[in-house]
Amino acid sequence: MKIKITKSGLKKDEVFFRTEFGEGRGIWCGAPMGPDTETDVEFELSELLMRWVDILPVPATEFDIRLEGDKVVFTGVLENIEEDGTGFLRLGESLVMFECLGEPMALGVFVEVQVRDVRIYPLSI
């Protein structure tokens, strides 16, 4: 996914970013980059998420990334959840992978995934 870094945060390597779907925050895991830098990245959601708590169905029809307090909220289509709990959220052409536990959820519907910890890795294209 293409992001534009908008500013540095207070934590070590924390950055705020903008995408075509909205704005968020995360920990930058690459060579230092300054504000106004655009780059392709992959998001890592390293928390173990609970279905029906951190992942909730929503009546949305558009992809979204936004900040809500200390959380980053990703709104996208729940593509798949494998038997081992690995889940995939579609945001436009990009997939965000996460680990989850809990009761089954319908696939192919819009959900919100709420996380506190987002790691951002630059993609080498």
Stretch-by-stretch model annotation:
Residues 6-8, 20-22, 31, 46-48, ...:
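Generic structural motif
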